Amino acid sequence: MSLRLGDTAPNFTGITTEGTIDFHQWLGNSWGVLFSHPADYTPVCTTELGAVSKIKAEFQKRNVKVMAVSVDPLDSHRGWIKDINETQACAINFPIIADENRQVASAYDMIHPNADDKATVRSVFIIGPDKKIKLTLTYPASTGRNFAEILRVIDSLQLTASHKVATPADWRGGEDCIVSPAVSDSEAQKLFPKGIRKVKPYLRYTPQPNL
């Protein structure tokens, strides 16, 4: 059964490159990014894991923990990490799950029904501190994930979780936001002291509230 936005992220206990981890316990009160790759020693995923390791500080300042998953065994992960560190000039600094029994892949619907049952699709799940799924993305094998976009989405999710706003197309942190349609004009004046710019009754902008 496919997971939907707002569903509780399935918990699991997994063997990882950083030891055995209970996923929900490991997350604690943090946000989480869980992303899968189809197999170790694949070229696109090699660049992706390297990219994530280089921006770990960006995830940390947003209170986000990152974990990767594939169905390959732990020894394979460890050998692949050496290649990633060498070719991407990085040091892998987050856990990679060895999901040999496909427990995680099945729980998160990462096995494409028309694909080899060994391969996971390249999915991304963003999970809130409440353990609810906030976003899902699935990429084709030929297209590397854009982690700048994933950080941008996290910024939007965290902002809109604490303020009655939405973020418009191509929004980036610090830019104007949209006042939620459920907020009346009088309430908006109280909630957003930086001011309101009303374009249409349903389209009202306000400077980004402070997090």
Language model features: what each stretch is:
Residues 1-211:
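Chalcogenol-based redox active-site neighborhoods
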